C-alpha cells in the first residue's frame, strides 16, 4: 500500500547548562521541551517542492501603515529563513531515497517561536526529514534523522555543533562535549520558558566572550572552568537516585549559579535579568538564560508554581511558555495510505 500523506513532529530544545563554556571544550546539557513543530508531507504532480507555512510564530512582528506604504518594523526575515531549512531537508531526503524529480508539498505549523534560541530551525528540519523520509518509504532511525538534520544545518548555516538537531530528533536530555553526545536518563522538569521578544546574535556574543577571554584569560578561565564543573554536577544530579524534591532544589541552585556566571561573561541583558528575577521572586527554584543571551529566552524550574511564574514573566514584559521536558524526539503522528 503506498503512503499518501505523513504528519511528523519534532520538539524545541533548551540548553539547560553550559552555554558559552561549551565553545571552550567544556560539556553542556541540552533537553527537548514540549513545544513542537508539525510538518505534513504529501506528493504533488508538479515535480516541484511546495512549502506551505500556516503558522510560523514570529512574536513581536510589528507592521506600520502609512497612506502609500506598508512597513515591517521587525525582523520578518526570520520566518522566511525557516523555509531554507525545509527545502534543504526535502532535497537531502529525496537524494537519500534516489527520487530527485518527485513533487512534494509540505505544510508547516509550529508552536516554537522563531529566532528565540529554542531550535526552531532544527525542529522544522527534523520534522520535515521525518515526514518526507516516511512518505518516500525510507526507514530511518531517530539517530539517522538527527544526523541528516545536522547535515541540513551545515548546508544552510555553514557551521553547526549538531546539538539542536540531535536533541530534536532523539528527545530527552543530551550531554554534549567536543562533538560527542550521550543520552541521559529521563526525569520530569516542570518548566516555564520566558521569551524577551528580541534575539541576540550568537556569532557576535561568542566573539565578544572570546575577545574578553583573550584580554583577561586569568579572570575568564576560572569562570569557564566553574561552568564546566557545574555541568558535571548537574549531570550527576540528573542521573542520581536522589528523591525528586532534592533533585529539583539542587538543579535550581545550579541554574542560579550558572546564570550568575553567564552574567559575569557579559551575555545577559536588563530584560533577561528582569525575567529571571521575576521568576525567582514568584517561587521558581532556579532561573537562568538559555542559549547565547543578548535577548532570546530564559527558563525557570517551577514545580507547583508554573502559573505564578508565568504571570510574573508576563508582568515583567516577557512571553511565558509553560512546558516540560519532552521524552520523545521526532515522532510520526499519522500516516494516510
Curated annotation (Swiss-Prot):
Localization in the cell: Cytoplasm
Residues where ATP binds: 113-123
GO CC, alphabetical: cytosol
GO biological process: isopentenyl diphosphate biosynthetic process, mevalonate pathway
Enzymatic reactions: (R)-mevalonate + ATP = (R)-5-phosphomevalonate + ADP + H(+)
EC number: 2.7.1.36
Location of the active site: 164
Keywords: ATP-binding, Cytoplasm, Isoprene biosynthesis, Kinase, Lipid biosynthesis, Lipid metabolism, Magnesium, Nucleotide-binding, Transferase
Pathway: Isoprenoid biosynthesis; isopentenyl diphosphate biosynthesis via mevalonate pathway; isopentenyl diphosphate from (R)-mevalonate: step 1/3
Requisite cofactors: Mg(2+)
GO molecular function, one term: ATP binding
Xref: SUPFAM superfamilies: GHMP Kinase, C-terminal domain, Ribosomal protein S5 domain 2-like
Reported function: Catalyzes the phosphorylation of (R)-mevalonate (MVA) to (R)-mevalonate 5-phosphate (MVAP). Functions in the mevalonate (MVA) pathway leading to isopentenyl diphosphate (IPP), a key precursor for the biosynthesis of isoprenoid compounds such as archaeal membrane lipids.
Family: Belongs to the GHMP kinase family. Mevalonate kinase subfamily.
PANTHER family referenced in this protein's UniProt entry, alphabetically: MEVALONATE KINASE
Subunit structure: Homodimer.
Name of the protein in question: Mevalonate kinase
Organism (species): Thermococcus kodakarensis (strain ATCC BAA-918 / JCM 12380 / KOD1) (Pyrococcus kodakaraensis (strain KOD1))
Gene that encodes it: mvk
Amino acid at each position: 500500500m503506498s503512503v499518501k500523506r505523513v504528519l511528523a513532529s519534532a520538539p524545541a530544545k533548551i540548553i539547560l547548562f553550559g552555554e558559552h563554556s561549551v565553545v571552550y571544550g567544556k560539556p553542556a546539557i541540552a533537553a527537548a521541551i514540549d513545544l513542537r513543530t508539525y510538518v505534513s508531507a504529501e506528493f504533488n504532480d508538479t515535480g516541484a517542492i511546495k512549502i506551505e507555512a500556516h503558522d510560523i510564530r514570529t512574536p513581536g512582528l510589528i507592521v506600520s501603515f502609512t497612506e502609500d506604504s506598508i512597513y515591517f518594523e521587525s525582523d520578518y526575515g526570520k520566518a522566511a529563513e525557516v523555509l531554507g531549512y525545509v527545502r534543504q531537508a526535502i532535497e537531502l531526503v529525496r537524494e537519500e531515497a534516489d527520487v530527485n524529480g518527485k513533487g512534494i508539498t509540505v505544510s508547516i505549523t509550529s508552536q516554537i517561536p522563531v529566532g528565540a534560541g529554542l531550535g526552531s530551525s532544527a525542529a522544522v528540519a527534523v520534522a520535515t526529514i521525518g515526514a518526507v523520509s516516511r512518505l518516500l518509504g525510507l526507514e530511518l532511525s531517530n539517530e539517522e534523522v538527527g544526523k541528516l538534520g545536522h547535515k541540513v544545518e551545515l548546508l544552510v548555516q555553514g557551521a553547526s555543533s549538531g546539538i539542536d538537531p540531535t536533541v530534536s530528533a532523539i528527545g530527552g536530555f543530551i550531554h554534549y562535549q567536543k562533538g560527542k553526545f550521550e543520552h541521559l536518563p529521563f526525569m520530569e522538569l516542570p518548566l516555564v520558558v520566558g521569551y524577551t521578544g528580541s534575539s541576540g546574535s550568537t556569532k557576535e556574543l561568542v566573539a565578544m566572550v572570546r575577545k574578553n577571554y583573550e584580554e583577561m584569560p586569568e579572570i575568564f578561565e576560572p569562570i569557564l572552568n566553574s561552568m564546566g564543573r557545574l555541568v558535571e554536577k548537574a549531570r550527576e544530579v540528573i542521573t542520581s537516585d536522589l528523591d525528586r524534591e532534592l533533585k529539583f532544589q539542587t538543579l535550581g541552585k545550579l541554574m542560579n549559579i550558572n546564570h550568575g556566571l553567564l552574567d559575569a561573561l557579559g551575555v545577559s541583558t536588563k530584560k533577561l535579568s528582569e525575567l529571571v528575577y521575576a521568576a525567582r521572586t514568584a517561587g521558581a527554584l532556579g532561573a537562568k538564560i538559555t542559549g547565547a543571551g543578548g535577548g532570546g529566552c530564559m527558563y525557570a524550574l517551577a514545580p507547583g508554581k508554573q502559573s505564578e511564574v508565568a504571570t510574573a514573566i508576563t508582568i515583567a514584559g516577557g512571553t511565558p511558555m509553560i512546558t516540560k521536558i519532552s521524552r520523545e524526539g521526532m515522532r510520526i503522528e499519522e500516516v494516510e495510505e
